[in-house]
Amino acid sequence: LKPVEEQGYLIVATNTANTDYVNCSETLAKTIKYWHPNARICLLTNHAREPDHLFDHVREFPFPIDEANPYANDWQVFYATPFRETIKLEADMLITSPVDHWWTMLRHRDVVVSTGCRDWKDQRAKSRHYRQVFDANNLPDVYNAITYWRLSKTAQEFFVTVRNIFENWPQYRAMLKFPEAAPSTDVVYAIAATIVGPETCTMPFASYPTIVHMKRHIIAAKRDPWVD
């Protein structure tokens, strides 16, 4: 599909047995529109629905999807976005302040996968509890929850690589220390960034954009789930 608008936010929402990610995406869209009423938002989902006051575009995955591992469909975002410049966001997030300045920073690259995360005190997270495979394999500390790309050969190469890793996971898994049984998007993005070149698709020196991560060991909660 060819882009029909210059820039916008793409929210990926595939419902699972345990989580209604489409509902999460609606809340995220509301927070984006609160700060930026004119922001353009596209919902990418496997559940048919019409555009509305929250979603200017609704797209279904353009290729057959992997039902066993919903993460493995992520490479399709490159082909599904209606925007020439896209910021992809995970559905289970909130935007708590203006983010329009992100575009200026991110345009320094054709692709930018966010690096590192912060705790609820807005400090760089120090816990590496969830990042053993990254540290053991010297992978870039990327978080796909915020990913930017513009229509370009570099972005196409990146997402072709992402697809290749997902579809050939046993071969990649065999090369890793402490590998995951099923590939997570963060690990796949980290491997893809290593292949394409971290200097090409990450900006670890930048203070933003980063997510505030609310996992137990990052926020030093005593139990999991900490909201109970």
Language-model segments: which ranges?
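Conserved catalytic core of nucleotide-sugar-dependent glycosyltransferases
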Residues: 104-166
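Short, polar loop motifs at secondary-structure junctions
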Residues: 44-51, 97-99, 206-207
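N-terminal anchoring/stem segment of glycosyltransferases
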Residues: 1-66, 151, 196, 225
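GT-A fold catalytic core of metal-dependent nucleotide-sugar glycosyltransferases
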Residues: 60, 70-124
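Catalytic phosphate/metal-binding cores of nucleic-acid and nucleotide-processing enzymes, i.e., regions
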Residues: 16-18, 23, 43, 80, ...
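Aromatic-acidic/polar surface patches that form glycan- and anion
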Residues: 14-25, 67, 136-140, 178-185
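Catalytic core and acceptor-binding pocket of nucleotide-sugar-dependent glycosyltransferases
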Residues: 139-228
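N-terminal cationic-hydrophobic initiation segments that often serve targeting/anchoring roles
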Residues: 33-34, 78-79, 103, 193-194
